[in-house]
Amino acid sequence: MIMPTPFVSQLSPSLFTTLREQLEKKGFVISIPPHTVFQGRSSTVSCTVYQSGKIVVQGKGTQEFVEFFLEPEILHSFSIQNVQQDLRPRIGVDESGKGDFFGPLCTAGVYAPSIKSIESLYEITICDSKLISDAKIPSLARSIRSLCTCKVITLFPEKYNALYANFQNLNALLAWTHATIIDDLAPKPTGDVFAISDQFASSERVLLQAVRKKRADIELIQRHRAEQDVVVAAASILARDAFLSSMQTLESQYQVRLLKGASGKVKQQAKEILRDKGQPVLEKVCKTHFKTFYEVLGSTS
């Protein structure tokens, strides 16, 4: 497989702290290898700042990271050219929350029915929600809703846990939510409209079979890193917006603070909720099939 070409530039020392803080907010793991000021790593990209001021970005997510974050928000210069705009009407689907111990699973779909609607998504610089700060998500979500037809399924923990007990498999549950949204959004007849989704299972067959049970005639495209498609990216923003607002709802309802992710800090917080609120409340704010849940229960027995 041909790897993307690394991006190399020069970074002013005055921006070192700003970049590091922004990467930390995005969940990058920070380290300090020899001869560097720091290095930030995510699942798709590494960003290394050397003592000389040279900055090197590598990994399969390089272009998106540079085009939508590094250049506009840090460097304030532009060298990477936009890819050719795909203006075909289509449905994009994505989810948020599947890796978070606390909170819901949110799946969102966006149907961009016209060239104008897709051009508008490009104009407001829609990109993968993981490259956007949480503070910017709500306003972008409002813009997307004004431009496209949208659908969101939010499974709060109580409902999520019941469905997981039925499906016994996260990918099967994801396939059901994705297929339901595609069926709801697809025009009838489908015509030339197709659907695009991230390939979240090892086999494309998992989602394809779920879609075929509901809608036999729509073309389905599954890709790794599908969020690079502007309509899927729009769906990722809607899903993230639903996740963030739902977390606030749970925090208010149960008077607890809920951290995102599944880190050691999250585990410690779960222990505190179990101690202060009891197991029934913990089960209403978390995904009980996570190993963390059983570790927390075991630590108090």
Curated annotation (Swiss-Prot):
Keywords of this entry: Cytoplasm, Endonuclease, Hydrolase, Magnesium, Metal-binding, Nuclease
GO cellular component terms listed in the entry, alphabetical order: cytoplasm; ribonuclease H2 complex
Entry EC no(s): 3.1.26.4
Top-level class of the enzyme under EC nomenclature: hydrolase
UniProt binding sites for a divalent metal cation: D94, E95, D198
Keyword Cytoplasm in annotation: yes
Cited Pfam families: DUF3378 (PF11858), RNase_HII (PF01351)
Cofactor binding summary note: Manganese or magnesium. Binds 1 divalent metal ion per monomer in the absence of substrate. May bind a second metal ion after substrate binding.
RNase H type-2 domain boundaries: 88-301
Signal peptide residue numbers: none
UniProt GO BP: DNA replication, removal of RNA primer; mismatch repair
Compartment list: Cytoplasm
Superkingdom, taxonomy of origin: Bacteria
Gene Ontology MF, one: RNA binding
Tagged with keyword Cytoplasm: yes
Cofactor: Mn(2+); Mg(2+)
Reactions accelerated catalytically: Endonucleolytic cleavage to 5'-phosphomonoester
Physiological role: Endonuclease that specifically degrades the RNA of RNA-DNA hybrids.
Family: Belongs to the RNase HII family. RnhC subfamily.
Name by which UniProt lists this protein: Ribonuclease HIII
